[in-house]
């Protein structure tokens, strides 16, 4: 499927529009990510300025840009399986954003799979912006591993009780039609980009999720991350 059609490219009807943009970056922080984690951090730090430039090139203005990070590992292995930041407003809080990223180190996780799906659930339940005439709610995910099925770690002492128990429940959250989970997230504004391996559940989500784009990698880990491609995909799509 054409990537811009999949994301919803409706041409130039929204030129000269102002957008409030929230981006949540779900980052695999397990030991196997050590060779690529610095590149992921570099992508995160440069993303806001590149995104503004890309939006300006399509005659769209970013009024407010916020970013949040969720670093995930494995509930059965790690004492801190999920590390979440607040939303940072950029560029004003660039220093705090960088400080949070600097504290993320590739460690733990054991063998795959990892608890990446829980990070998506946390992202969807975040305090997304609901101000402004036009909004984008963007999730970027970076992992070199398959995912633990939702709910499989429920027996772990530190596993939360307020998360979806299946891909179907997560999909309902993504589409904004969940009966059990509510947040400021708006499906119309939602965009997902995943740099993921060609494994469960990413192949399943690729077939079923709308407004989502997946860059599949081989089994040896993530390939180089093309930040320009991410920006191009997002700025060519409209709410």
Annotate each PLM feature.
Residues 1-24, 30-39:
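Acidic, polar low-complexity linker/tail segments
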Residues 27-28, 40, 69, 120, ...:
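DG-centered beta-turn motif at the end of beta-strands
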Residues 77-79, 85-138, 147-148:
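Von Willebrand factor
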Residues 29-33, 74-77, 109, 144-149, ...:
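Solvent-exposed loop/turn segments at secondary-structure junctions
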Residues 20-21, 31-66:
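…and closely analogous acidic/polar surface helices at protein-protein or active-site interfaces
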Residues 4-18, 56-61, 123-137, 182-186:
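Surface-exposed acidic, glycine-flexible loop patches that form ligand/cofactor-binding
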Residues 145-208:
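VWA/integrin I-like adhesion module and closely mimicked acidic/polar interface patches used
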Residues 15-16, 210-239:
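C-terminal "exit" segments of structured domains
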């Amino acid at each position: 499927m054409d990537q811009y059609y999949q994301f919803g490219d409706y041409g130039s009807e929204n030129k000269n529009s102002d957008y409030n943009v929230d981006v949540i970056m779900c980052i695999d922080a397990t030991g196997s990510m050590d060779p690529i984690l610095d590149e992921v951090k570099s992508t995160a730090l440069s993303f806001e300025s590149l995104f503004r430039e890309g939006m300006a090139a399509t005659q769209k203005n970013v009024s407010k840009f916020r970013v949040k990070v969720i670093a995930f590992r494995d509930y059965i292995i790690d004492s801190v399986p999920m590390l979440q930041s607040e939303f940072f407003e950029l560029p004003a809080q660039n220093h705090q954003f960088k400080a949070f990223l600097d504290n993320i180190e590739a460690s733990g996780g054991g063998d795959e799979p990892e608890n990446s799906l829980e990070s998506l659930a946390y992202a969807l339940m975040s305090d997304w912006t609901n101000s402004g005439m036009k909004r984008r709610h963007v999730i970027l995910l970076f992992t070199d591993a398959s995912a633990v099925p939702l709910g499989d770690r429920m027996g772990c002492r530190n596993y939360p009780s307020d998360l979806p128990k299946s891909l179907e429940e997560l999909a309902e959250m993504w589409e904004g039609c969940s009966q059990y989970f509510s947040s400021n997230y708006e499906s119309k504004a939602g965009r997902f980009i995943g740099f993921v391996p060609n494994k469960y559940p990413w192949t399943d989500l690729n077939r079923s999720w709308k407004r989502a784009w997946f860059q599949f990698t081989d089994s040896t880990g993530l390939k180089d991350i093309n930040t320009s491609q991410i920006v191009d995909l997002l700025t060519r799509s409209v709410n």
